[in-house]
Amino acid sequence: WIMGHMVNSIEQVDKFLDLGANAIEFDVDFDDDGVAKYTHHGIPCDCGRLCNKYAVFTEYLDYVRQVTTPGDPKFRKELVLLALDLKLQRISSEKAYAAGVDVATKLLDHYWMRGKNGGRAYILLNIPLVKHYEFIRAFKDTLRKEGHEQYNAKVGINFTGNEDLDEIRKVLEKLGEDEHIWQADGIASCIPRGTERLKKVLEKRDTPGYKYISKVYAWTLVRSSIMRRSLSLGVDGVMSNYPDIVVKVLKEKKFSDKFRLATYADNPWEKFTPI
């Protein structure tokens, strides 16, 4: 999975797909009451990027629904995963539940269309810290109350704050969640980061019987040398400001035999087991 990073304006969606992304990540900004308002990152952000591009959240969902609905004139078959970077750290953790209700409702109304020809992409909920876990409970509660639990099959969870892996596991156990789990490791592109935690994450993923990590991605990678390092370790995904560079690296002999771009037929919630 090549995840285009910080794709926050509507016109950026197709640009990142044209560069080779098959997944996009966008920031969801909330008001003080936990209402999702905009796709917006703000200052500071990654080096070399414009931090203030944005769209109204519901309008953005309307657009990506079209891009991921077969038969729609805007349909792009390559876009298979939407990663919502939920900016919950900007609001009180007591509002995490309200935020989960709001995001689930807006996805039902503007993306899934409550079963009437909605978008088909998988949804990854990127949650900053384990203390925001009530967002997940609220999201699942809302799908159940609204009679649309079928969409749980399309939804995955990821904690992005580089926290202790055992603390993350404990929270997932508390929530009763042991599937559809990604684990990210990374930092803003301007700052160097070693591989110590990433190696631990991959080791957990590859431990037989360990349920709390199915897929792993590294972020935000901009240099081809760091992309090679992460791919050599065996990540499932790379988040980048430059999907075209990831595409070039994947074509190198060392990686072209081992990796290919994920398509809609690939399940993003299953552990990959090489044949």
UniProtKB/Swiss-Prot annotation:
| GO biological process annotation, one example | killing of cells of another organism
Q: What is this protein called?
A: Dermonecrotic toxin SpeSicTox-betaIIA1
UniProt: Mg(2+) binding residues: 25, 27, 85
List the GO cellular component terms: extracellular region
Q: Which family does it belong to?
A: Belongs to the arthropod phospholipase D family. Class II subfamily.
GO molecular function terms listed in the Swiss-Prot or TrEMBL record = lyase activity; metal ion binding; phosphoric diester hydrolase activity; toxin activity
CDD domains recorded: GDPD_like_SMaseD_PLD
InterPro entries recorded for this chain? Answer: PLC-like_Pdiesterase_TIM-brl (IPR017946)
